[in-house]
Curated annotation (Swiss-Prot):
Pathway: Amino-acid biosynthesis; L-leucine biosynthesis; L-leucine from 3-methyl-2-oxobutanoate: step 1/4. Pfam families: HCS_D2, HMGL-like, LeuA_dimer. InterPro entries: 2-IPM_HCS-like, 2-isopropylmalate_synth_dimer, AIPM/Hcit_synth_CS, Aldolase_TIM, LeuA/HCS_post-cat, LeuA_allosteric_dom_sf, LeuA_bact_synth, PYR_CT. Keywords: Amino-acid biosynthesis, Branched-chain amino acid biosynthesis, Cytoplasm, Leucine biosynthesis, Manganese, Metal-binding, Transferase. GO terms for biological process: L-leucine biosynthetic process. This is 2-isopropylmalate synthase. PANTHER family: 2-ISOPROPYLMALATE SYNTHASE 1, CHLOROPLASTIC-RELATED, HOMOCITRATE SYNTHASE-RELATED. Residues 408-540 are annotated as: Regulatory domain. Mn(2+) binds at residues 17, 208, 210, 244. Residues 8-269 form the Pyruvate carboxyltransferase domain. Catalyzes the condensation of the acetyl group of acetyl-CoA with 3-methyl-2-oxobutanoate (2-ketoisovalerate) to form 3-carboxy-3-hydroxy-4-methylpentanoate (2-isopropylmalate). It comes from Prochlorococcus marinus (strain MIT 9313).
Amino acid sequence: MAKDPGRVLIFDTTLRDGEQSPGASLNLEEKLAIAQQLARLGVDVIEAGFPFASQGDFAAVQRIAQQVGGDEGPIICGLARASRADIKACADAVAPAPRRRIHTFIATSDIHLEHKLRKSRAEVLAIVPEMVAYARSLVDDVEFSCEDAARSDPEFLYEVIEAAIAAGAGTINIPDTVGFTTPSEFGALIAGIDCHVPNMNEAVISVHGHNDLGLAVANFLEAVKSGARQFECTINGIGERAGNAALEELVMALYVRRRYFNPFFGREPDSPTPLTAVRTEEITKTSRLVSNLTGMVVQPNKAIVGSNAFAHESGIHQDGVLKNRLTYEIVDARTVGLSDNRISLGKLSGRSAVRARLEELGYDLTREDLDEAFARFKDLADRKRDITDRDLEAIVSEQVQQSEARFQLRLVQVSCGSSLRPTATVILAQEDGQEQTAAAVGTGPVDAVCRALNALAGEPNELIEFSVKSVTEGIDAMGEVTIRLRRDGQLFSGHSADTDVVVAAAQAFVNALNRLVAGCGRQSLHPQHDAVLADLRSGI
C-alpha cells in the first residue's frame, strides 16, 4: 500500500495552475499576499509557480520561498518539466525555503506521446528515472506527475511510477489533466496503482483534477477511499478551462462527512481528529482575497464561498432556519469564517485601531502600506458611516494590486444626465510623475472615462468585460468593479472598490492597463502547452 500520512495533505496550486486562468495573472506582491494567506489557511504545500517560465515567475517563487517558507510553515514547491534546465531553475528558486520540493512531470498518455512529445514509451520510460534522480540530487523532496494519467494505459503507468519511485520520488501525482474521468473510474485507477506498483509503499499517492465535466471534487472523494492522500486544488476552483478541484469544497466535504470518511483512514467513525490541517475559519477570507486579486468573480451559488451559499429565499426554509439552522444548513457559516461582524471604527478612529483590526483579519502591513491604508480608511469614513471588514479587505487588496504601476490615476471627473452627453476628464501620472490630462465623451460615464484613459495611455486594448457589485448592503456601500482588457489574445484584469462606482471603474481600468503594460512582451512559458524543449527531444 501507498504511504499513508494518516490524514489528507492539501497541495494548493492557486499560484501556478490557478493563475493559468485567462486574465488571472498576478504580480509578485499579489502572489506573496496570497501565499501568506495560504500559510495562514494551513495548506501543507504551496506550488508557488513555474520558475523556468520567466524571470518574473522565478522571482515570485524565490520570494515566497524566502518569506513564506519556514521550519513550521508549508512546503514551498515549484513546477518543472522533465528537463535539466527546468529542474535546475526550480531548485534554485525554492532554495531559500527550509522545506522545499521540486514537482517534475512528463506526459504518459499515448495521445500526448504521439502528438506533443513525439516520443515512444521506451524513451519516456528512460527519461523519468534520469530526471527524477537529478531532481533528487538537488532537493530531498521530489514529486513526480504522470501528465494525462487518466487517459494513459494503466500497465504503462505502473511501469513509469515504479521507475520514478525507484529514482527517489516521494510523492506520485496522478492528474486528470483534461477532466475526462468519472469518480468510479478514477477510484479504480488509484486502487490499481496502489495494488500493482511494487514499491508504492515508498511514496504518497497524490491526485490532481480539472473540472471540465464538473466532477473534480467528486473524483477526489472517490480517490480518498482508494488510498490517495495528497490532493492538488485551488482556491475558488480557478484554473484553466473549467478550473481545478476547489480546495474549499474538498476540505468542507471531508469536514462535514468525516464520519463517513474516517474509516478509510483506519479511524473510528466518531473520531474528532480533523482529516486536514486546514483552518476552515480562514476559507472565506482566502476566497475573497484570491477573487479580489485575480479579478475572478465567485459565482453567487458557488458551494461554500458563494454569496448565496448560506442564503434562504423560501419561506419554509427561512422558518426552519430560524427555529434551528441545521434544518436546512449542513455547515455553520462561522465554520468557514463567514460573519456579519461590523467593526466600530469611524472617522474618529486612530491608526492603531485600524492596524489592530487589520492584524486580526490577517494582514501584516509595512509601515508605509499601513499609512496608505489608513489614509484610504479615513477618506472612506468621511463618506460612509459604518465600516465593515469587507470594506477594509477591499482597501488592502487594492493596494497590493498597485505595486507595479506605470500609470497612476490622479483625477476623474464626469458630467452626465438625461439631456447631457456623458463627458469625462481624467488626469493620469506616468512613472516619472509627469501628469497629462484628457477629456472624452462616451455612451455613458464609464465609457467616457475609459476612452479618456485610453487616449492618454496609448496602449491598444479591447474592453471585454465590465462588472460591478456591492461590497456590503446599504446606499453608501462600496462598489467593486472588475474590468478585463484583451490584447494579442491575452487577458488582463483590473479590480477596484469605491463608494463612487465611476471612480472605482476608472481605477480598475488603470489597474488593468498596468497589468497589460507589465505583461505584454514578456509572456511566460506554459508548462503543458510549451512542453517540448530541444533537450527533451534529445532525451536529456
